[in-house]
Structures are given as C-alpha cells and as structure tokens.
C-alpha cells in the first residue's frame, strides 16, 4: 500500500505594500516544508508567489470599517475552502480579521507585527494579542510575556 504524505497548509495573509513584502520574507522559506497558500488585498500580488495558490480578499481599514462585514464573508469562505492548519499574517486590518475568524474555526494563528513599529505595537497588533495564538514583534524592546521576539525580516 502507498502512503500519501500531505504537507500541513499555511494560509499567509497580508495587505498590499510593506505588510505583503514582509510576509513574503517570512513565508517563502516555509514553502519547502509546507503548502503555503497566499491571500492579499490586491490581485497583482499573485505574480509574487510563483505556483502557490492565491486568493484576493476585500481591503478595508478603520476609515471604511463598514467593509468589514462583506470582508468577513469573503475571508470565511476562503478559510472554509482551504482549511489551513495555521494562519500567519503581518497585517494590517484584513489580516487581523482573518486571525479572528481563524480562531473561531479552531485554526492556529500567528501575528507578526510590522518592522515599522519600533516604539510601540501597531493598533492591530495590540488587538491581535487578544485573539492570536502567537504574537511576535520584530524589535526586542517590545517583547513582553504575551509578545515574543524571534528576530526580524532583516535577519538581525
């Protein structure tokens, strides 16, 4: 009999821009050991993930928070289709919503706060502490009992 080995699936989520660039720095090395499925707020991000599966999610922020409701249905549909073992995100608001919905479906979740946040955690990062399974900062000075430091995207 043959044994089919299935890789654990990671859903990697970020808004377009700096959050997306940081996510790719973190997740590209994981593609050797895991099935990484990407999700971002702009379809052009698909061109940056090679042959990995890609989903586009609705974008929103605190300035147009009403979009959070339709975005929730969009994200939940993707979560139920993909059924990842874990979700990793670098933000921003759509990544936080994905973590909240992921926890509701029993998925392990990882928030990595942006390297741009040197003095304090981002607003979404502070909220992520209440929902995410694991929360990371990229600055040792921001580490706490709840927020871990494990290096940064520059390899420091």
Name what the model sees in each region.
Residues 2-45:
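N-terminal subdomain of nucleotide-sugar transferases
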Residues 9, 85-86:
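Structural motif
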Residues 9, 34-38, 53, 108, ...:
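Residues at the starts of beta-strands that form the adenosine-phosphate
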Residues 12-13, 39, 89, 112, ...:
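Short hydrophobic segments within beta-strands
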Residues 14, 34-71, 141, 148-153:
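Conserved nucleotide-sugar phosphate-binding/catalytic loop shared by glycosyltransferases and other
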Residues 63-85:
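An amphipathic, basic-hydrophobic alpha-helix
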Residues 86-105:
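An aromatic- and histidine-rich active-site surface loop
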Residues 107-156:
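Active-site-proximal region of nucleotide-activated glycan assembly enzymes
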